[in-house]
Amino acid sequence: MKLLGTIIGSAFFLQAVSGFFFDSGHQNRQQQQQQQQQRDVGSYQQMFLDNDCPHYLCPQTLDCVRQKSDCACPFPNSQLKCNLPNGQVICISKPATHDPTLVEIYDDPVMGPAQRTEGFRDCGWILDVYDGKI
């Protein structure tokens, strides 16, 4: 009976100790992440405020352009820039395809956004959604 009591007592003790170390490590990691995020926000904010762009400063890339619609997508190698009829612009992932011709078209900054390929979620598909066709 004494052995059973020792085993149960040890189990509770180990559980409490592991909970203490896990929780302490978890809080420390969370605190470090919060500090890093605050630094990132602070440096972004400082770059945004220190920018002397006389026109429009793109919020995602900090590029200085004439107008909002001239902003590039933040990841142009993997995104298409789709222009909506209301003047807004959205960036979507380029469709995944193994067809070299389509890859070349989607990589072209002029032809890619104008492409409308059946079965692909490209800018043509986005316009269909915008128009309520899908």
Curated annotation (Swiss-Prot):
Residues 1-19 form the signal peptide. The keyword Signal applies. InterPro entries: LCL2 (IPR034543). Keywords: Signal. Belongs to the LCL2 family. Probable component of the endoplasmic reticulum-associated degradation (ERAD) pathway. This is Long chronological lifespan protein 2.
